[in-house]
């Protein structure tokens, strides 16, 4: 059935139901359409609530929906919507007073989701602060701008952009989400682009390490423009194809959120899964070569394994392998669901923080460059203080003035 025809039938049913309600409850006659002012027509919102014909300036209340998204709501509470002075309905409907009726299991899950959301906010905030600090360090310390650190810098940039757009998505309220606004779809598209670029820069990190360690190929022959193309340009056609698919096949809910059976999201999730699998192969080869070199050394076996484990743990967030630990929901039982919720929230929100710590704050080149800057600043400050004191103290016969030193030097 045509969507416009279906909507017309629903609105007609809405009008009939409201007319019956008015007659039964004795609400009186609806506003006179021939009156001096325009009025708001009977309409049906995106959630399915019927709003009756109302006078301009009226704040209309309707019972909360009985069911929405499979959740039962308390119908004794009301939703509110304003009929504007120009005879049109306000775009925003106030459903804030509608409360779900939850059983014990749903209440438990609701509590866990709330805690997970707090972990997400905390992790993203901590990550953004650490990432911005790391970004500024790479920006200021020009002496360390080799290809490896430029790759780290770009990866950190994608984390910053991804986290900022994540915060923007959290600001979208339910009405805008259900209304499928254009700007809302644009924010979702930009967010998904930064998600894909983030994973592709993890892939670039893996390519660089695999080339340098496993293939023993000189990194001097690697070209920066090629990595920039992989990290920033290849995700563009992927996201464009996804946006076209969403526009024609799943144009709803701001293009955010995935229902079972929706395949359009795999247009960008497929390449992400592919680069994660390739990075997993890179990690396996890197650790294998590392173990081979450690066995050839004279260190004890315990120290060898400790170094290998340490290197593996450091590489996990850089290559995005942590996402593979809980990429798929493990099951329907309570324990699996709770573990899935908390691990996903922690790993995804704090990954930017771990990347900043391991590859900037613990980076030997960064720390050495910072120490040199600090020593130069101390030396410069130490030289300026005695000179300022010498120029401010009056000279005496027993004290050699700064002016006399200059004259002696001139002679």
Swiss-Prot record:
Q: List localization entries.
A: Cell membrane
Q: Where are the transmembrane segments?
A: 109-139, 147-171, 186-214, 222-249, 266-291, 303-327, 335-364
> What residues are glycosylation sites in this protein?
13, 41, 74, 86, 94
Cystine links in this protein are 14-50, 40-83, 64-98, 184-254
PTM annotation: A N-glycosylation site within the signal peptide impedes its proper cleavage and function.
How does this chain assemble? Answer: Monomer. Interacts (via N-terminal extracellular domain) with CRF, UCN, UCN2 and UCN3.
Q: What does this protein do?
A: G-protein coupled receptor for CRH (corticotropin-releasing factor), UCN (urocortin), UCN2 and UCN3. Has high affinity for UCN. Ligand binding causes a conformation change that triggers signaling via guanine nucleotide-binding proteins (G proteins) and down-stream effectors, such as adenylate cyclase. Promotes the activation of adenylate cyclase, leading to increased intracellular cAMP levels.
The identity of this protein, by name, is: Corticotropin-releasing factor receptor 2
**Gene that encodes it:** Crhr2
């Amino acid at each position: 059935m045509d969507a416009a025809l279906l909507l017309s039938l629903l609105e007609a049913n809405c009008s009939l139901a409201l007319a019956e309600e008015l007659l039964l409850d004795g609400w009186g006659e609806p506003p006179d359409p021939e009156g001096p002012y325009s009025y708001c027509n009977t309409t049906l919102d995106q959630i399915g609530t019927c709003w009756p014909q109302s006078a301009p300036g009226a704040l209309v209340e309707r019972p909360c929906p009985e069911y929405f998204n499979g959740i039962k709501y308390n119908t004794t509470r009301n939703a509110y919507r304003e009929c504007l002075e120009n005879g049109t309905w306000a775009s925003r409907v106030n459903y804030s007073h509608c409360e779900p009726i939850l059983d014990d299991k749903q209440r438990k899950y609701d509590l866990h989701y709330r805690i997970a959301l707090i972990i997400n906010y905390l992790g993203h905030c901590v990550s953004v602060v650490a990432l911005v600090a790391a970004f500024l360090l790479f920006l200021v310390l020009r002496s360390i701008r080799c290809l490896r650190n430029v790759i780290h810098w770009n990866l950190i940039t994608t984390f910053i952009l991804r986290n900022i757009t994540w915060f923007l998505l959290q600001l979208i309220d339910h009405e805008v989400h259900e209304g499928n606004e254009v700007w809302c779809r644009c924010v979702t598209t930009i967010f998904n682009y930064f998600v894909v670029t983030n994973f592709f820069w993890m892939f670039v990190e893996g390519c660089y390490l695999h080339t340098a360690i496993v293939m023993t190929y000189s990194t001097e022959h690697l070209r920066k423009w090629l990595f920039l193309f992989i990290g920033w340009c290849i995700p563009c056609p992927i996201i464009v194809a996804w946006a076209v698919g969403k526009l024609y096949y799943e144009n709803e809910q701001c293009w955010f959120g995935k229902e079972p059976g929706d395949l359009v999201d795999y247009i960008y999730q497929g390449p992400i899964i592919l680069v994660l699998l390739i990075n997993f192969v890179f990690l396996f080869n890197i650790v294998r070569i590392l173990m081979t070199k450690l066995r050839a050394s004279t260190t004890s076996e315990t120290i060898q394994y400790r170094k290998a484990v340490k290197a593996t743990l450091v590489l996990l967030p850089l290559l995005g392998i942590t996402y593979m630990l809980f990429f798929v929901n493990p099951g329907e039982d309570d324990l699996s669901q709770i573990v899935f919720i908390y691990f996903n929230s922690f790993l995804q929100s704090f990954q930017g923080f771990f990347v900043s710590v391991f590859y900037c704050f613990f980076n030997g080149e960064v720390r050495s460059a910072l120490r040199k800057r600090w020593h130069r600043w101390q030396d410069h400050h130490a030289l300026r203080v005695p000179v300022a004191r010498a120029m401010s103290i009056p000279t005496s016969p027993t004290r050699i003035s700064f002016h006399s030193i200059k004259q002696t030097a001139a002679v």
